[in-house]
């Protein structure tokens, strides 16, 4: 069995050359990155007891970035001292990520693979599932595979979209058709998942919830902030028991 959806992989492969163009098709992710990094550091610092203001605060931690794309999260995590493995089902994405890391003298272990194919049981302190679960083919298998790769007491961050009318209006109609922030067809609303449903799936896999936050975009300041509003974007932080 596989978690790969070939249509989804082809979709992102076609855009691979634009990963590091801050005004290109991945501009929304570039805008998203600061709040994602801030949140990961906040939760991880409390869990692993380190100081955020340390420029190498993630030193000694092994991180798996699933669906790493061109390396937008892998690179800052590496700069903060983590030992990062980035995997993606698109060979083109991995090629772009490797080239960009080399250009910036960053040592990142990039692999063209999927979590169910990695033979690395209990290997990682942190797993990053950022804007990935809404694109996989078999969510249950995907989450099971992630659980096996994470160390006991390790953290997993899952960022995705809630399955609500608001998310359909904002994330699909608004972002894809009206504002054209994303190419039409980037998201399939049927693959969005409610936070409580995701929590239940992870609870069944022996995870416990550490934190849940919404993420909302402020159009005036053109930035993302944490929010109590879970109706569209949210991040769920969980610990493997």
Predicted feature residues:
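Conserved alpha-helix/loop element of class I SAM-dependent methyltransferases that forms part
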Residues: 31-59
């Amino acid at each position: 069995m596989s978690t790969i959806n070939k249509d989804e992989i082809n979709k992102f492969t076609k855009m691979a050359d634009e990963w590091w163009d801050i005004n290109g098709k991945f501009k929304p992710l570039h805008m998203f990155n600061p709040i994602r990094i801030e949140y990961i550091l906040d939760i991880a610092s409390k869990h692993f007891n380190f100081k955020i203001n340390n420029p190498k605060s993630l030193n000694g931690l092994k991180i798996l970035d699933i669906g790493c794309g061109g390396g937008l999260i892998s690179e800052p995590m590496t700069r903060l001292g983590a030992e990062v493995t980035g995997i993606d089902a698109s060979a083109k994405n991995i090629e772009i990520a490797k080239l960009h890391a080399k250009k910036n003298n960053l040592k990142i272990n990039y692999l063209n693979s999927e979590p169910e194919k990695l033979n690395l049981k209990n290997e990682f302190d942190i797993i990053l599932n950022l804007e990935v679960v809404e694109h996989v083919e078999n969510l249950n298998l995907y989450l099971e595979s992630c659980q096996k790769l994470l160390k006991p007491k390790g953290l997993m961050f899952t960022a995705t979209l809630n399955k609500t009318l608001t998310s359909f209006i904002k994330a699909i109609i608004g972002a894809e058709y009206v504002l054209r922030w994303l190419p039409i067809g980037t998201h399939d609303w049927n693959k969005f998942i409610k936070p409580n449903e995701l929590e239940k799936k992870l609870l069944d896999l022996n995870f416990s919830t550490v934190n849940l936050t919404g993420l909302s975009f402020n159009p005036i300041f053109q930035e993302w902030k944490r929010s109590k509003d879970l109706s569209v974007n949210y991040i769920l932080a969980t610990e493997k028991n």
